[in-house]
Amino acid sequence: MRTHDDTWDIRTSVGATAVMVAAARAVETSKPEPLIRDPYARMLVTNANAGVIWEAMLDQEMVAKVEAIDAETAATVEHMRSYQAVRTNFFDTYFADAVAAGIRQVVILASGLDSRAYRLDWPAGTTVYEIDQPQVLAYKSATLAENGVTPAAERREVAIDLRQDWPSALRAAGFDPSARTAWLAEGLLMYLPAEAQDRLFTQIGELSCAGSRIAAETAGNHADERREQMRERFRKVAQTLGLEQTIDVHELIYHDPDRALLGQWLNEHGWRANAQNACDEMHRVGRWVEGVPMADDKQAYSEFVTAERL
């Protein structure tokens, strides 16, 4: 259960979800024709010791094992992996376009195990700020350093909870509000209540000069009944395979009916926004997975929103 002042490291609560996402990137990277390449994802998963269930996701045969128990759940697992690859690719492209337009200041909110500061081709003079819980940032930087991995841009950690005064901490780390910025909120908004989401984007707007850009993944809107059905099916599959569920992701997410539509909100607050439904993006890049239970419900899918400050 979430509280207003809860905290975590890489093995617990919201922190452990970053391991799940990195596992999906590692699986995608190992494919013959990967949509994205993250050579550091696997080491970030295996060194986290966040639980057997996350490391099991690295197993290429996992979907086959799940399929023998529950075909729809297997399709959902494969869908989740594909979704993470599509999402990563979309935001990688966003950053490539931003730096091509001359932006040299990047802020990744709730960066988790995001390795873009290390794996993307950043132009000289680019500074990447990563904001997250202190223990999460410490784990990532230490693990990569111990394995001889160095950033491809100037990387600055801002170790603070986004519910605290992160704008002041960001400025103290050297952030320049007068310089155009490329912001990213990926895998974040579903862990915020509606009012916190509005406050976050208000703060971003206050720190963004004209020409700045933002990209964000919105929270999907699964029907309560369907969400509970899938939750129970995942639990049974994990139990059958002998995988201990160290966290329940559903308990970490805020299912808030009053949440603003992000694209619309940004258009009303000094940005020019566009939104791409994740379902459509998966079809566009050829990564749609057939047989998922929510295939007929576009509202169940997140949107990838991009916007430019006017």
From Swiss-Prot:
Q: Name one GO molecular function term.
A: methyltransferase activity
The superkingdom listed in its UniProt entry is Bacteria
Give the protein's recorded name: Putative S-adenosyl-L-methionine-dependent methyltransferase MMAR_0357
UniProt keywords (A-Z) are: Methyltransferase, S-adenosyl-L-methionine, Transferase
**Which taxonomic lineage does the organism of this UniProt entry have?**
Bacteria, Bacillati, Actinomycetota, Actinomycetes, Mycobacteriales
Q: What is its EC number?
A: 2.1.1.-
Report the InterPro entries cross-referenced here: Ppm1/Ppm2/Tcmp, SAM-dependent_MTases_sf, SAM_mthyl_Trfase_ML2640-like
Biological role stated in the UniProt entry: Exhibits S-adenosyl-L-methionine-dependent methyltransferase activity.
Residues that hold S-adenosyl-L-methionine according to the record: D132, D161, L162
List GO BP terms, alphabetically: methylation
**EC primary class:** transferase
Q: Spell out the family assignment given in the record's similarity comment.
A: Belongs to the UPF0677 family.
Q: Which organism is this entry from?
A: Mycobacterium marinum (strain ATCC BAA-535 / M)
